[in-house]
Curated annotation (Swiss-Prot):
It comes from Saccharopolyspora erythraea (strain ATCC 11635 / DSM 40517 / JCM 4748 / NBRC 13426 / NCIMB 8594 / NRRL 2338). The keyword DNA-binding applies. This is Transcription elongation factor GreA. Disulfide bonds: none annotated. The gene is greA. One of its GO terms (biological process) is DNA-templated transcription elongation. Gene3D superfamilies: Transcription elongation factor, GreA/GreB, C-terminal domain, Transcription elongation factor, GreA/GreB, N-terminal domain.
Amino acid sequence: MSETQVTWLTQDAFDRLKSELDELVGNRPVIAAKINEAREEGDLKENGGYHAAREEQGHLESRIRQLQELLRTAKVGDVPTEAGVAKPGSVLTVRYDDEDETEKFLLATREEGAHGDLEVYSPSSPLGQALLDAKEGETREYELPNGGTMKVTLVKAEPFTG
């Protein structure tokens, strides 16, 4: 059994996701009514309205479960203030395999970074896991999807300021 992944969220992101969840839960009766109306039209095999409503219900329930799990495992708090160390909620500048170019991204969940201009990488991704708790100047190695490995150096870690 795998251990539960804790997700760091600001209070604003938590509130935004909670509002979305409340709205989706409130829409359940509307979708159920659509399904019942379509069901009353007769033959379900060729009932496009029924199938569309069932598909909509499936998407709704999937998102509800996703949000419930995310909020259940959320660690709500302020942006990490510790500069120089890679933590969820930090903006990281990294260099891959001694290349000259650097990349800058937010180490957070997609939900947390949904309103920013930065690329967002999850702390549970291979890159995110490799960089967690790394100090500036430290080089780590992580596994690529194709099975190869890549070295990445943390150039800078700073608190996310929005």
